[in-house]
Amino acid sequence: MICQDPWRGRHNHRDHRNAGQATFDAVYPYARDHLHFPEQLEEGLETHKVLEIYATMTENPDVIVDISDCIHDEINALKEHKSQIGDPDALEQRILSNTSELAESHGFEYAEGFKRHTFSFGRAPTPKTQA
């Protein structure tokens, strides 16, 4: 599961934090616990245990992913939020600068960082991975 980091202390939009918190709440305990939505069991749906959440826009990433092959797809998608973007060229330069700075010490051209959160539910968590 990927969501925004709800605990980010710097500049962050309230709706982004709330979406991140709602995602964490949905993963644990709601998705895994059959008592929260018994009507779904009656409809034939099963509970699901999410074992990992990767939080984006975090201040303390512990997973760094090479996004060199898709950075421009991300930028172009963000530019489509025309009502939210004042200067699309400045946005592009800021993203390229930030992602290249993070990538520099990892041998990538562009990178994105995530904070990995695990939920083992009595099982050993999976090892960290990097793309």
Language model features with spans:
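Metal-dependent de-N-acetylase/amidase catalytic core
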Residues: 1-131
